Amino acid sequence: MSSSPEKKRRKKLSPESNSLPNDLIVTILARLSQSYYPKLSLVSKTFRAILASPELYQTRILLSRTETFLYVCLSFPGEPNPGWFTLYRKPNQTLTTKKKKNSVHLLAPILNSPPVEFPSLIAVGSYLYAFRAAIEEGTSDSLNCVEVYNTDTQTWIPVPPNKRIFKLQHMKGMLYMKVSKLLSFVAQDAEELAPLFPKLRSLLSTEVVAFKPKVSEGYEVLGFSVNTDLGRGSFCMIEEITYHYDPSVKFRWRRRQGGVWRSLVGLEGLPKFARYSSVKLADCGGKLVVLWHKYVPASGYEEKMVWCAEISLEKRSKKEIWGKIEWFDAVLRVPKYYQFVGAKSATV
């Protein structure tokens, strides 16, 4: 009966055992980088439940352990639904200046993504508010255009027709959504939004703005979505600065209130992009993220590899901004006819 003690030992060490209080497990997990969470979710049902709980996110806030993640939406040929991904750094990996064979970062798929494309994304706290094009049409069914992604539980929250908290009405030709006393949305083009939101004056087309009223008067802009895609070029806004990439002028910047375009200095070590490559920019916690692709010759040029670079920005003067390459990596292999839909960062 030698197996009996061994069974007892395995049972004692089982992840499902209640040897540790849930509060202690939450505190331990909250101190870890979320890059470990996908593998930890495989440990047990208890871990999966804790990793998807709001309590874990609140504990991360209390311990100042929040992180900023980039969420990317891609569409693929033959797939009716777009795919959503999170940019992760692989656990137990260290960056090095030496040439490496294995990728340190990757775009990990998000399960249970909504079956619609949402070109307009706004990050407010730990939530991503996704708006599809229907909001611009002003139809009575426009409320169906909103879906919410809870980044701490990693779940999409639809808005059921019988439980909608959104109120939609026409106000001087613009669409207005009141979610609560502290959060509202407006959808409008840049020219008509300018009188209400002067800080958003730019060359870009502002699609949706999230704001909340201040205690005294006025408003506070919480986030906004803009049309940042111009063919092979791309725009991105970070801390009142508009960054732009175009194959003919490379990387440049200008202040959102206007002014001349200036070249982004530095960027040593950033690979050259292929002529056919579509380059996209995104803000991730105040850093500039660049996404581009290359063909994979081994696939017979039927697949592409999506690459990603993270650039820290330093304002050395009013007329000079330097970009430093923190890292670049191959993050996802895709079919050659994939399309980039959008990207947005959120703090979780």
Swiss-Prot record:
Protein's organism: Arabidopsis thaliana
Domain F-box: 14-60
Name under which the protein is recorded: F-box protein At2g20380
Pfam families: F-box (PF00646), Kelch_1 (PF01344), Kelch_FKB95 (PF25210)
InterPro entries for the chain: F-box-like_dom_sf (IPR036047), F-box/kelch-repeat_ARATH (IPR050354), F-box_dom (IPR001810), Kelch-typ_b-propeller (IPR015915), Kelch_1 (IPR006652)
Transmembrane segments: none
Cited CDD domains: F-box_AtAFR-like
SUPFAM superfamilies the UniProt entry points to: F-box domain, Kelch motif
